[in-house]
Amino acid sequence: MKRLFNPLMAASVVMLASACQKVERIEVKPAKVELSEAGQVVALSAQAVTEKGEPVEKAELVFASSDAKVATVDATGKVSAVKSGSAAITVTSGEVSARAPVEVVIPAAITVKGAPFTLTGLGSEVAVEAEVQDDAGRPVTTAKLEYASADANVVAVEGNKLIAKAVGTTTVTATSGKLKQEVPVTVKLPEVDAVAFETVPATLKVGESAELAVVAKGTDGAAIQGVSFTYTTSDEKIATVDATGKVTAVKAGSVTIKAEGGSKAAETKLTIKKK
C-alpha cells in the first residue's frame, strides 16, 4: 500500500516541537556590567535556553533596570550609565528571569588629605594621601594618581612624596584621568635658635682676605640649611666684609665682625696685623 506525504501534518509537527520548547533559564553576558562614564553603553546578550541547554530562538525577552537613576536599559538590552551607584538588569521570559548586576563608578573629584601643606626645613618631606571619589561620594579604589610640582626648585615630587628644596610657595597638582586637584605647598625654615661662627682666622695681615663660615642652629641644635646672613664690621677702616662673609684686612688693628640670620646674631673679633 502506498503512503502519501502530507505537508500539513509535517508543518504541524514542527510547530508543535517549537511550542514545546520550554524556557528553563536565561543566560546573560556579560554576567556583570561595569561602567565608568556617564552615557557609556554596554550591550547585554541574553539567550533563553531549555533544560537541555538548547536555545529557544523565538522566546520573548523583556529587559528592566532596578534603578533607572543609576543605569537604564532599552528593549534590545543596551545598558547606559546615568550616575554612580549599584543597580541590576533583570531579563524576563514568561516566568523565568535572570539578573545582571550593574556597577556605575564615575570619578568626580580628588580629595587630598592634609592640604595645604607646609614643609619646615630644606630637605623635609611629606607623603601625599589622596583619594578619587565618584559622584556618589564613594572612593574609587582602582583610580591611579600622579603628582606634579609647578616649581620643582621649591618642591620636588618623587611618587607621592614632596621634598622641600627652597623657601617659597608653589602648587602641586594631583591628576587622575581627566580629574585634577591643585594644592598649595609652602616651604619655610625652622626657627633659628642660635647663630655661630665656625671658621674664623686668628689674624689677618693687611691686604689678606678670608671667608667666614657661619651656621644657624635650631632648638634641637641641628644646623639649618638655607638661612641668609647679613654681615657688618665695627670699623671699615680696619677690615671690610661683603655680603658673602668675605673679610678683607685694610690696616692694622682690632675689629668686630657681626653675622645676623633669622633674628639671631653672633660676633667674632679679628686682629689685623701689618704686612
Please state what every model-predicted region is.
Residues 3, 20-275:
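Extracytoplasmic soluble-region selector
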Residues 1-18:
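Sec-dependent bacterial lipoprotein signal peptides
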